[in-house]
Amino acid sequence: MIPSERVGIVGYGAYVPRYRIKAEEIAAVWGDDVDSIKSGLMIEEKSVPSETEDSATIAVEAAKNAVARAEIDPKDIGAIYVGSESPPYAVKPTATIVAAAIGATPDLTAADYEFACKAGTAAIQTCAGLVASGMIKYGLAIGADTAQGAPGDPLEYTAAAGGAAFVIGRKKLVAEMEGTYSYTTDTPDFWRREGQPYPRHGGRFTGAPAYFKHIIRAARGLMEELDLSPEDFDYAVFHQPNGKFPRKVARSLGFEPEQVEPTIVVDRVGNTYSGSSLLGFTAALDRAEPGDRILVVSYGSGAGSDAFSFVVTERIEEVREKAPLLEEYLEDRVYVTYGEYAKMKKKLKF
């Protein structure tokens, strides 16, 4: 899908809770071999939301940063879409909370999206379509989650909290969208039924037929459509469920480590689900120079991938410092014990 009109990112923002738990702390409780865990998942620690944080508060913080960089009146935002698989309410949209918090209400459309870890990129596609068609001036797309892993499950080492937001428009772009491509199938690799507190894994479906197949098909489809190859990109961002998968899929597609390593943050923050690939994207934008081309490929269980190509403009240097960089959130951390973590994540039921 190639936009018929110029469209792209006007402002972007990230947010990561300051609390962290080290892999060693989790391993000590469950008697796991921490060296095997860290080498297998390529992760050191993960973010933990405080008792007063949820995907809505994370979305609000990221949105405020995006609007600050966009330098727009929030009233000009015509659509807000929040992608998450951990909304604080079963029946009440997160998008309206964000709209009110940033002063965008009441003349706009808003909705919540759910497609596992790629709901945020689906929101970007929708906003881009509305903006390019002329139906709205600006759209705000957000991916935010407070992921859960069952006590003792390997997922507990990676399921984390964080999010990113993007103001989509046609003028004053910091990154122009060249195109987007999606690949979608019905693959039962990961799910959580209504009423279940924690998700379940699909075993043999979780690797090659899910993550790798979808990301590779989406990335190749986009590059073929745009007549681009891996060497045409300065940065490549892939969904980061752990540190091993994005590096492996990058090699499979022909990307070099220097294109990928600057965008990998999972080792320091964990898998933020809907925020995962988008946080990697903000890491690239935080250091990109005008003219740089960035590939972003999300993945959501169930299953699907959205791929994008963006070209950074000169305006990035004007607005980058108008909101906190992702690195500032990664450095601002307070470590907690497993007991504190269990309390914050409400794993203890009374």
Curated annotation (Swiss-Prot):
Q: List the catalysed reactions.
A: acetoacetyl-CoA + acetyl-CoA + H2O = (3S)-3-hydroxy-3-methylglutaryl-CoA + CoA + H(+)
Which cysteine pairs are covalently linked by disulfides here?
none
UniProt lists the family membership as follows:
Belongs to the thiolase-like superfamily. Archaeal HMG-CoA synthase family.
Pathway per its UniProt entry is:
Metabolic intermediate biosynthesis; (R)-mevalonate biosynthesis; (R)-mevalonate from acetyl-CoA: step 2/3
Name the Pfam families for this protein.
Answer: ACP_syn_III_C (PF08541)
Protein name per UniProt: Hydroxymethylglutaryl-CoA synthase
Which Gene3D superfamilies does this UniProt record tie to the protein? 3.40.47.10
Q: What GO terms describe the biological role, i.e. biological process, of this protein? A: farnesyl diphosphate biosynthetic process, mevalonate pathway; isopentenyl diphosphate biosynthetic process, mevalonate pathway
**Residues noted as binding (3S)-3-hydroxy-3-methylglutaryl-CoA in the record, renumbered to the chain:** D33, V34, C117, T158, T206, H239, K248, N271, S301
The active site annotation covers E85 (proton donor/acceptor), C117 (acyl-thioester intermediate), H239 (proton donor/acceptor)
Q: Any idea which GO molecular function terms this record carries?
A: acetyl-CoA C-acetyltransferase activity; hydroxymethylglutaryl-CoA synthase activity
| Known function | Catalyzes the condensation of acetyl-CoA with acetoacetyl-CoA to form 3-hydroxy-3-methylglutaryl-CoA (HMG-CoA). Functions in the mevalonate (MVA) pathway leading to isopentenyl diphosphate (IPP), a key precursor for the biosynthesis of isoprenoid compounds that are building blocks of archaeal membrane lipids.
State the superkingdom.
Archaea
Report quaternary structure and partners.
Answer: Interacts with acetoacetyl-CoA thiolase that catalyzes the precedent step in the pathway and with a DUF35 protein. The acetoacetyl-CoA thiolase/HMG-CoA synthase complex channels the intermediate via a fused CoA-binding site, which allows for efficient coupling of the endergonic thiolase reaction with the exergonic HMGCS reaction.
Sorted alphabetically, which HAMAP family does this protein's record hold? HMG_CoA_synth_arch
Q: What is its EC number?
A: 2.3.3.10
Chain sites annotated for binding CoA:
R204, K244
Which organism is this protein's natural source? Methanopyrus kandleri (strain AV19 / DSM 6324 / JCM 9639 / NBRC 100938)
Enzyme class per UniProt: transferase
Alphabetized, the UniProt keywords read: Acyltransferase, Isoprene biosynthesis, Transferase
